[in-house]
């Protein structure tokens, strides 16, 4: 039903494999009066789990420790809803690109893939938008994983907190297909990592580093922003009013790359990441190319 609020105050829950802790397709709620409030700490011991999957306004105050397994997603926003990580610490583990398992702390929206466009419209999944806001802390602790991901015209990602890249080949914010991202906070990395990327902005997406925004990376082959596109699409756009401090051997503040070079720039398969969840579905899918693996609830 609609307008049914979900308040989770259980101290701790554990997810094993292919599970979703809170799922709601109710689109109601506001920042002051959320449809979902989660105060529960969520731990994943396995893989391909979702902490919160929501269409309404959701506030997360719990800590999510999803670092043990691969392919875990902290929160996923659909149907133009908003998920706000108000006070929580969301930690994601690794990704296995070859096995289609991606760790993402916060994700929003879905846009048709090239494979979808080959199908009749009636057989395509529903495109959807979402909004994600981080006011807490995101730790990206596994290779090839992402802090914040937004896809689609109308989808937004806003970081007011801290995104920390704590493993090789990790990315702070990934914006694609006309999504818009704002950084008011900090994107940084742990000591000793390499090949980290602050922001990827792709296919007409836009990234605005606001006046208070800081992208500070000190790592071998660190990259502040990658602007890229698929064939026939437009490059991503960046507006910088804040601070970029990118240091380390082989580091670059900004790089422009055509799609054919994206694998080399980001690591295995990053250009093919999409989150495939039709609006209203009870299962979610993280898709790499043509290979799909679905959580079950």
Where would I find each of the regions flagged by the language model?
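Long, low-complexity, polar and repeat-rich extracellular regions
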Residues: 1-297
């Amino acid at each position: 039903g609609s307008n049914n609020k979900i308040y989770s105050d259980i101290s701790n829950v554990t997810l094993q494999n292919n599970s979703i802790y809170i799922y709601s397709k109710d689109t109601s709620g506001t920042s002051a009066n959320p449809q979902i409030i989660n105060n529960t700490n969520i731990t994943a011991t396995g893989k391909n789990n979702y902490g919160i999957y929501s269409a309404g306004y959701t506030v997360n105050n719990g800590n999510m420790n999803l670092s043990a397994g691969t392919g875990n997603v902290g929160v996923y926003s659909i149907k133009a809803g908003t998920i706000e990580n108000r006070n929580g610490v969301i930690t994601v583990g690794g990704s296995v690109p070859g096995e289609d398992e991606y760790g993402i702390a916060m994700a929003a929206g879905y846009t048709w893939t090239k494979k979808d466009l080959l199908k009749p419209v009636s057989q395509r999944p529903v495109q959807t938008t979402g909004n994600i806001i981080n006011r807490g802390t995101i730790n990206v602790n596994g290779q090839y994983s992402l802090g914040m991901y937004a896809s689609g015209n109308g989808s937004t990602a806003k970081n007011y907190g801290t995104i920390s890249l704590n493993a090789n080949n990790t990315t702070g914010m990934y914006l694609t297909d006309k999504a818009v991202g704002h950084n008011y906070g900090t994107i940084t990395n742990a000591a000793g990592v390499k090949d980290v990327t602050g922001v990827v902005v792709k296919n007409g997406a836009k990234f605005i580093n606001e006046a208070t925004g800081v992208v500070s990376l000190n790592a071998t082959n660190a990259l502040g922003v990658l602007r890229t596109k698929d064939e026939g699409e437009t490059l991503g756009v960046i507006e910088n009013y804040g601070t970029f401090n990118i240091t380390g051997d082989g580091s670059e503040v900004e790089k422009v790359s055509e799609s054919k070079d994206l694998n080399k720039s980001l690591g295995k398969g990053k250009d093919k990441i999409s989150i495939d969840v039709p609006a209203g579905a009870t299962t979610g899918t993280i898709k790499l190319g043509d290979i799909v693996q679905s959580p079950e609830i």
